[in-house]
Design a protein with these regions (language model features):
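Substrate-binding beta-hairpin/strand module that engages nucleic acids
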Residues: 3-7, 174-182
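Short coil/turn segments at secondary-structure boundaries
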Residues: 44-46, 96-105, 153, 198-202, ...
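Helix-hairpin-helix/helix-loop-helix acidic hairpins
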Residues: 109-147
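Acidic, carboxylate-rich catalytic segments that either coordinate divalent cations
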Residues: 93, 182, 187-229
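An anion-engaging/catalytic patch
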Residues: 1-51
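Active-site substrate-recognition loop segments, prototypically the cytochrome P450 B′-helix/B-C loop
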Residues: 88-94, 99-112
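N-terminal structured helix/loop subdomain that forms the ligand-binding/catalytic interface
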Residues: 36-91, 95, 164-175, 227
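Catalytic DNA-binding helix-loop module of base-excision-repair DNA glycosylases/AP lyases
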Residues: 135-169
Length: 229
C-alpha cells in the first residue's frame, strides 16, 4: 500500500479533511532501519524480500513456486508430490532436499516414524483416500506423523495439504485465520486425536484457490509457524 500511496487525506476534529504526511516504500525501509529491534529487522526483511537466512531464501522459493506455475504440475496426494515440493522449497539450501530421511528423528519428546519403517508407512499413507475433508485431514495428520524429511516437514506438508483440498474440494486453507499456538498444540494432539486440528482447518477453509494473495499470505504464515519465539 505504501508503495502506491503519495498523499492521504484524513478528517480532523474540525470536520475538515487535511493532507497527511505519508511514507513511500523507501521511507518505510529507512524507518525500520532506525529501530534497533530484532522484530523490526524481521519486518524489514519481509517487506523487502531481502532475508538472507535459510528460511528467508526458502520462502522466496515458495513464492516462486506459485509465480512459475510449477505448483500446478505436482502430483496431488502422493509421496512423490511431497518430495517435489520439499525439493523446490529447499533445493540448494539442504543437501537432503526432497530426499526421504534415513535416520530416526524426534521433536518435543515425540519420536516420529522410525526410519526403518518409513518407506512402508509412506506407501500406506499415499494409499489413504482423499475425497472428503475428513479423509484429507486424516491423510495430512498421518503424513505429519511420518515426518519424511530431516527438516522442513511442516512447510512442505502444509502446501501438500492445500493442493489436495484444492484438487478434491475446490478449497484451500486461509492460514491467517489459524493462531500459531493453537495450530501447534492441535498438531501435537493430532497424534492421538485429530478433532482439534480438523476443527481449526475446517473453520479456515476458503474458495479463493487461485488467489495469489491467499497463497502468498499462506506461505508467510506457514513459515511464521516454524519460527522460534
Amino acid at each position: 500500500m505504501v508503495s502506491a500511496t503519495t498523499q492521504l487525506k484524513l478528517r480532523a476534529a474540525d470536520g475538515k479533511k487535511y493532507n497527511t504526511d505519508v511514507l513511500d516504500a523507501k521511507g518505510i525501509v529507512l524507518l525500520a532501519k532506525s529501530v534497533s529491534n530484532q522484530r523490526a529487522m524481521a519486518f524489514l526483511d519481509w517487506l523487502t524480500y531481502s532475508d538472507s537466512t535459510l528460511d528467508g531464501q526458502s520462502r522466496k522459493k515458495a513464492y516462486a513456486l506459485f509465480e512459475s506455475k510449477l505448483i500446478d504440475s505436482i502430483p496431488v496426494g502422493t509421496v512423490k508430490g511431497l518430495q517435489q515440493i520439499h525439493s523446490l522449497l529447499f533445493g540448494g539450501l539442504y543437501d537432503f532436499a526432497g530426499k526421504i530421511r534415513t535416520k530416526t528423528i524426534s521433536k518435543g519428546g515425540f519420536t516420529f516414524c522410525l526410519h526403518e519403517y518409513l518407506p512402508k508407512q509412506l506407501e500406506i499413507v499415499e494409499r489413504m483416500p482423499e475425497t472428503t475433508f475428513d479423509e484429507i485431514a486424516d491423510k495430512y495428520v498421518e503424513m505429519n506423523v511420518c515426518h519424511p524429511f530431516m527438516e522442513g516437514n511442516g512447510r512442505a506438508t502444509r502446501i501438500w495439504l492445500d493442493l489436495m483440498l484444492k484438487a478434491r474440494l475446490q478449497r484451500c486453507v486461509d492460514w491467517s485465520k489459524i493462531n500459531k499456538n493453537d495450530y501447534l498444540q492441535a498438531m501435537t494432539l493430532s497424534v492421538a486425536d485429530a478433532t482439534r486440528i480438523k476443527t481449526l482447518l475446517q473453520g479456515a477453509l476458503t474458495d479463493r484457490i487461485n488467489d495469489r494473495e491467499m497463497f502468498m499470505k499462506g506461505i508467510d504464515y506457514s513459515y511464521y509457524y516454524e519460527q522460534q519465539e
